[in-house]
Each structure stands twice: as structure tokens, then as C-alpha cells.
From Swiss-Prot:
Residues 55-72, 140-161 have a biased composition (Acidic residues). This is U3 small nucleolar RNA-associated protein 25. Residues 1-168 are annotated as: Disordered. It is found in: Nucleus, Nucleolus.
């Protein structure tokens, strides 16, 4: 059906054209839509929509003529339905994967309840708070003066990465790259560079297979002054004097890929210092992006008033542009507080409520490791979503999500909206126009439920199901053509890079600007073994995977464990009890526990993240007394509790821990037992099973050079002492 016939059948289109508009925008159909392979175009029905004047609202809503609001809303709903019919024919919805809920996807029932229980806000109150963020918000929108200080208006310099990334990319290039991703005809070309003697980076950029494309090392200035910051941010953050150098060594590494809108996967060193420094930088970047987006809209509002016939594409489907995912309310408090302090805005609505619900001065026991004290300090509640709306004079916390510029959430909190069991409450339209995404402290999130992060990516940058006051005449074409993923910048910060982190940045990000990752060279003296301080036999067993199949790796590991390690335990020439088997993955734990129950006569017990407190106490006591020969111990329980397991004489690591601190903490169980005179270090052993796929964890435990030898040499058994 032609577009003209659609208009004839729908009276809502009649007499509804923007006055003075000469040209209509086009929506491209994919070439596969016609038998002849030609490209069809349809007049953008949304071009004919007018909108009521709303200059005071700084959002993705444009100004227009005044008319009856109820009539306008009815027309817009019908027009949007027509537009969705066209768009969904271009971009069919993939079938939803059936998600199987098992124990590994549940939150640990008992974890931290004795030390970090948050009784201030119950789960019901938290859920209502989140749902309120989706309700219609009829607050006064005349709170943002559409005028802006002329000194702080951007010059739209083509050298500004904000302009070159979002506004200067040829449409033909975007279409070709988008089609290449769909047909899996994309490859990444990479270059390596040095950051220091012990750190390097890898920059990779997507190119269409068959095209001659030279990928050069990204421009490095290591200076914040190389980028176009808003004047308000310069004044607020002391960046007016270019003779000063405000950046730390860490920030100099990150400033270029960050402000060039490249995807980032960054592995940092220090919990306290490094986290504070990279948050300073990304808070500045986020604010700069929000301010530039707002000012561009305001400037184009003025241009349209001067010349209504011009076309200005500067908006997405919905207002939110930044999504920040953090593990706990404590981290959310620190991030939001950082954003407020750097914003240059004094008025913050509902700041007291936010501090009451997110700030907590409680500290974990000092007997726990320092890393534990850092991760679990303050408010450890992991169920929240909060919106931040920026006007010229104020920041509004707890704003309606569709009226927010920034959304700060936990994986569990936003999961409740995206995958709500009540289908009527499911929504993801507010994620349709995200241009910057930050995942902070991924290493902590991985112990909550990493699948929630992948769920978020499934819902990003989709075409909305409903209209949300968007001016279709100003929506960028790459939003309409469902190409926003090519423009979205994703930044992931973690203490330890893991396979899951690599999977996110490599498999779920399509940024046309490429991705930037750092890699740290770990000397043997800085490895876990080098810092253990114990002279104990540490034996590493490698098993090979036929065909290097990642999918079959768990089966090969289990086969090696049951055919080599279990017989060794049964016929042990060392201690007959006190054997601790450390298992990082819960599914592996279930498999091993079932095997030992059904196939062996070994007297064993187990403690895991789902054990009741009674089971935890009973099995730990029996193991310490030697009445249990073997104890199965999960990594997730260790992360949340950091128990001191007594009675340990030997350790078997079913897989190298991703966190190298855990390796030393578990090995020291033997050392503490030896100090009490209950074991002999000359008889005790530590065994670790690994494959080539464990390279990331292995190099943190034995060092980078040793890990390469262990992974690729002919020998399959290596011993350290």
C-alpha cells in the first residue's frame, strides 16, 4: 500500500502537515524487501505530525503550534501506530529466548544477612519506588529556560568528537556497516600500543569484509584540553587554565578513548584510588554529553523558529541518553554524588531523600580482607533504579524515567522492569535512545547475576512500542533504521577482566568507533604465588580440549577431575582428611556433588551460597573435626562471606579463581592450620586444574610469562613451591 493511500484512509493525516515544509524525510527499506532487490522508500508519515510548543522543557521534544491537547494526543497515537507498522516490517522482532530459571540465577538467600542486612527499605517498598519511575509524571515542565548563555553554546566544530561521531558520519557508511553486521560480514582489525612498561592497549575497529581498510592507532593526547568541554564544566572543575595538568596517570590513559566515544573495557588496580579517578572522568564525559545534546536541541529550536522549512535531526525516540549500571546503592550514591558535584548546578531536588535511601556509614568487620571491606561497605542493597533529569537550573532526582537524562540502576532493579513476570508492567522503551552506557564494578556484578547484564543489552536501542512525545521530524535516521547500536558507547570498568567481560565488549557492542581494551603484564613477583609467602607444593594440571570448543570445555574439565583428581583423593598418599575442593561455578558444583554422592564412597560435605546458616555451621564444624574427609566450597559463598575454613590440609581448585585474592586466601587456610600445628606444609599440597581458556585467571595467579608457558608448552603438569 502506498503512503498516499494510507493518508487517504486515515483522516488524522489530513490538514496535518507542517506549514512551509518543502521536503519530506524518507524511511529506507532494506534491499531484501522487494523481489527485484531494489530499495523502496516511504514518505515518513511522522513528518506530518506537529507538536505543541514546549521550549521550556529540555528534552527530545520540539516546539510547534498550539492546538487542542486531547485531539493532538489522539492523532499522535494513531500516527505512531502507523509508523510502527512500517518500522516493524523493516525490523522483525527476534523470538524471545526461553529462559530457564535455576538455582544459579537466584540471589543467595543467606549471603551477608548476618553482617549486611538492610532493614531500612523492604523489597516491596523498593519495587514500588521503581514502578513509580514509570508512571506518568505531570510535574511542571516550565522549569528550564530555553535560553542559554551564548558563551556556552557549542560552535559545532567538526573536530569535536560529539559532532564527528553522532552528526557527521555519512549515511551510506552507516547503512553498509549495519548490513554487514546483519549478514555477519564484519571483521575487526586491531592495533596494539604501549601505555607503560607493564601495560598495553588493543584497539579494534569493525570493517566490512572485502574492503581495504587501514586501522590506525587512535589519536593520543592524554589531555582533557584536546576535547570540547562545555564552559560550565570548565568553570566548575577548574579546567580554564591550560597550563595546569589536572589528569592523573590513569585518567591520561582513558581520556582519549573515552572522549572519542570508543567502547572501553578497562581493568584497574586500586579499589579506592582508581575507582575514584575513572569515575571523575566518566562523570565529566557524561555531563558533557548531556549538556551538548540539550544545547543542540535548543539551538535548533531557535533555527526552526527563524526558518520552519529547515530540517534538523537531533533527537532519539525517548529522552534518556545515559545508562549507568552499578552493583549496590553505595556505589550508586558515590556515582550520583560525583555527577552532582561536577555538574555546576547548585539546586538538587530530592537530594535528602536520595541520601537517606542510598547513603550508609556502616562498615564490615575489620577482620575481613580490605577488598571485602571496600565492596561491602555502606548500603549493599542491590535493588534500585533512579532517574536524573537536568534542567538549566536544577537536577531532579527520582524523575520519571521517560523524562530523565541519566538512569542509574542495579542489574536486578532494571531486570524487574525489563522482564517483569507481570507482562503488563514490562517496559523497555526508555532504553531506546541510550547513547552512553557505563558498567561500573563488573567484577562485583558477576557475583550477583551476570545474566541480568546480558538481558539489559537485549533491550537496548530497540524501536519503542509506544510513542513518548517524540517529534518525528527531528529523530535521527539511524534511530529510525534501528542502527543506534553502531553509535552507542559502552564503557566497562572492572578489577579483573573475565571471559564474561570480554563477551560483553566483543559480542554485545557494535560501536563503529571501535573498542579499546587495556592489558596488564603481571610479573611473577606480583602474582598470587609470588605474594603467598608460603612454601607449599602448588601443582597445576592442564587438560586439553579437542577442537578448542568453549561449549564442551566444562565436560572435558569434569572428565579430567573424575578420572585423575578423584582417584588421587581415594588413594591419597598424603592426608586422608582436610581436603577442600574450591569450585568457582555453581553448575559445576552441582555436577560434582551429584557425582560424589552417586559414584564414590568418599565421606564429604558441602557449603554453598544457598546453604542455610545451620548447614554452614554444622558442615564447617564436622570438617574441622576431621569427620568429613572432603569439603566442597563455592566461590560465590567465599565472595559474600570470606569464611576462614578451619581444618584444611590440602586444596583442589576445580578452576582458577577469577579473583587472584581468593587463591591466596584459600591457600592460607593451610598455612593457618599449620601454624596451629595441625598439618605439615611438606605434606600438604595445592592442586589447580586449568585449560588454555583459563589464561586470564592463570596469569594473575602465576604471572604473565609463566601463564604463557603453562598454556602452550608440551608439559601438562607444573609445580611451584
Amino acid at each position: 500500500m502506498s503512503d498516499s493511500s494510507v493518508r487517504e484512509k486515515n483522516d488524522n493525516f489530513r490538514g496535518y502537515r507542517k506549514r512551509g515544509r518543502q521536503e519530506l524525510r524518507k524511511i529506507k527499506r532494506s534491499s531484501a524487501r522487494t523481489e527485484g532487490g531494489s530499495t523502496e522508500t516511504l514518505e515518513d508519515v511522522a513528518e506530518d505530525i506537529d507538536h505543541r510548543s514546549d521550549e521550556d522543557e529540555v528534552s527530545d521534544v520540539d516546539s510547534g503550534d498550539d492546538f487542542d491537547i486531547e485531539d493532538e494526543e489522539g492523532k499522535k497515537e494513531k500516527v505512531y501506530d502507523a509508523l510502527l507498522t512500517i518500522l516493524k516490517s523493516e525490523h522483525p522482532e527476534p523470538k524471545r529466548r526461553r529462559r530457564e530459571a535455576d538455582e544459579s540465577n537466584k540471589a543467595p538467600a543467606e549471603v551477608g544477612e548476618d553482617e549486611h542486612e538492610n532493614t531500612e527499605h523492604g523489597p516491596v517498598d523498593d519495587q514500588l519506588e521503581i514502578e513509580n519511575g514509570l508512571l506518568g509524571n505531570h510535574e511542571d515542565d516550565n522549569d528550564d529556560d530555553s535560553s542559554e548563555d551564548e558563551k556556552d553554546i557549542d560552535s559545532e566544530d567538526e573536530q569535536d568528537p560529539f559532532e564527528s561521531h553522532f552528526n557527521q558520519v555519512p549515511e551510506k557508511f552507516v547503512d553498509e556497516l549495519s548490513n554487514a553486521f546483519k549478514t555477519k560480514s564484519v571483521k575487526y582489525k586491531s592495533v596494539k600500543g604501549s601505555l607503560s612498561d607493564s601495560e598495553s592497549y588493543i584497539y579494534a575497529k569493525p570493517v566490512v569484509i572485502g574492503e581495504e581498510a587501514l586501522v590506525e592507532s587512535p589519536y593520543r593526547s592524554s589531555s582533557i584540553y584536546s576535547y570540547f568541554l562545555k564552559q560550565r564544566l570548565k568553570v566548575q572543575n577548574g579546567l580554564l587554565d591550560k597550563k595546569t595538568d589536572p589528569l592523573t596517570a590513569l585518567q591520561k590513559k582513558l581520556v582519549d578513548p573515552m572522549f572519542q566515544y570508543k567502547d572501553i573495557l578497562y581493568e584497574y588496580d586500586s579499589y579506592e584510588k582508581d575507582e575514584d579517578e575513572y569515575r571523575d572522568l566518566y562523570a565529566l564525559h557524561v555531563l558533557n554529553h548531556i549538556y551538548k545534546t540539550r544545547d543542540r536541541i535548543l539551538k535548533n529550536n531557535q533555527r526552526l523558529q527563524d526558518n520552519p522549512d529547515t530540517e534538523h535531526l537531533d533527537q532519539g525516540f525517548t529522552r534518556p541518553k545515559v545508562l549507568i549500571v552499578v552493583p549496590t546503592r553505595e556505589v550508586a550514591y558515590r556515582v550520583v554524588d560525583k555527577i552532582i558535584s561536577k555538574s555546576g548546578i547548585d539546586q538538587v531536588d530530592k537530594k535528602g531523600k536520595f541520601y537517606d535511601q542510598f547513603r550508609d556509614d556502616s562498615l564490615p568487620p575489620k577482620s575481613k580482607p580490605k577488598s571485602f571491606q571496600h565492596i561491602f561497605r555502606g548500603n549493599t542493597n542491590d535493588f534500585f533504579v533512579v532517574g536524573l533529569k537536568f534542567t538549566r537550573k536544577a537536577i531532579k532526582l527520582y524523575s520519571n524515567f521517560y523524562q530523565s537524562d541519566i538512569i542509574v540502576c542495579s542489574p536486578l532493579g532494571i531486570q524487574m522492569i525489563l522482564e517483569n513476570t507481570d507482562k503488563k508492567k514490562r517496559q523497555d522503551d526508555f532504553l531506546s535512545s541510550i547513547e552512553l552506557m557505563v558498567i561500573d564494578q563488573l567484577h562485583s556484578i558477576e557475583y550477583q547475576n551476570i545474566s541480568h547484564i546480558f538481558t539489559i543489552f537485549d533491550h537496548l536501542n530497540k524501536i519503542p512500542d509506544q510513542q513518548h512525545e517524540a517529534d518525528f521530524s527531528r529523530i535521527r535516521m539511524w534511530y529510525i533504521n534501528e542502527q543506534a547500536k553502531l553509535f552507542r558507547q559502552t564503557m566497562v570498568f572492572t578489577k579483573y577482566i573475565s571471559p564474561a567481560a570480554n563477551s560483553l565488549i566483543n559480542g554485545r557492542c557494535r560501536n563503529m568507533a571501535g573498542r579499546w581494551k587495556n592489558h596488564k603484564v603481571i610479573g611473577s613477583e606480583n602474582s598470587s604465588i609470588g605474594q603467598s609467602g608460603l612454601k607449599i607444593r602448588q601443582i597445576f594440571h592442564r587438560f586439553d580440549i579437542i577442537g578448542n570448543s568453549i561449549i564442551e570445555e566444562p565436560d572435558y574439565r569434569f572428565k579430567f577431575f573424575t578420572s585423575v583428581i578423584i582417584p588421587g583423593i581415594v588413594k591419597s598418599t598424603g592426608y586422608e582428611d582436610g581436603i577442600l575442593i574450591y569450585i568457582p561455578d555453581y553448575t559445576d558444583f552441582i555436577r560434582i556433588r551429584n557425582y560424589m554422592k552417586e559414584k564414590t564412597t568418599i565421606l564429604f560435605g558441602d557449603i554453598n551460597e544457598y546453604s542455610s546458616q545451620r548447614q554452614l555451621n554444622a558442615n564447617r564444624s564436622l570438617f574441622q573435626q576431621g569427620r568429613l574427609k572432603v569439603m566442597l566450597y563455592t566461590e560465590r559463598l567465599h565472595h559474600y562471606r570470606r569464611y576462614e575454613i578451619k581444618g584444611v590440609k590440602s586444596v583442589v581448585f576445580y578452576k582458577p579463581p577469577n579473583n587472584p585474592e581468593f587463591y591466596n586466601e584459600v591457600v592460607r587456610f593451610i598455612g593457618k592450620n599449620a601454624f596451629l600445628g595441625n598439618t605439615d606444609l611438606n605434606i600438604s599440597t595445592v592442586r589447580c586444574i586449568y585449560s588454555k581458556l583459563d589464561g586470564l585467571s592463570l596469569e594473575r595467579i602465576v604471572g604473565t610469562k609463566r601463564a604463557a608457558v603453562l598454556s602452550h608448552a608440551q608439559k601438562e603438569i607444573y609445580e611451584f613451591k
